[in-house]
Amino acid sequence: AKAGMIALPLALLILLFVFGSAVAALVPLLLAITAVFATNALIALPSQFIPVDEQIAEVILLVGLAVGVDYSLFYLRREREERAAGRGERAALEAAAATSGRAVLVSGITVLIAMAGMLFSGAKTFMSFSIGTMMVVAVAMIGSLTVLPALLSKLGDRVEKGRIPFLRRLT
């Protein structure tokens, strides 16, 4: 819980700096937090069959925050670049899906494969962390490829709401 108390506000500040907009900064956090909550619920299933380390919730939070924000950042940044270049809403979303969507998929699969290696360590803590990490990465990846484009489509230009004037020049 202590790590989350530090990581969440810090992530929000960084995202505000990067995007210069409150709504654009909150979208990646929303996706990451949703992935964390979903994974914390889903971890109950494997915990019926294998021991789950008591620190798994912290691992899920920190990894989920990292990949959830990262995957959203790829997508949202690309969609905003396309809009700034004059593309319409749908064309911008399609371009983001074709480029950033593919990057999210490849990145997510790579992390899943790498984390699967810990399953063979023989150490119960590593196995537990591997399962939690793989689950949160998969949930964040699926959310980034499905929920995020739908959310951006629904938000449209409102993703720019809450612009922070002095940050406008930095993004």
PLM feature segments, named:
Residues 1-171:
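Membrane-embedded transmembrane helical bundles of large multi-pass transporters/channels
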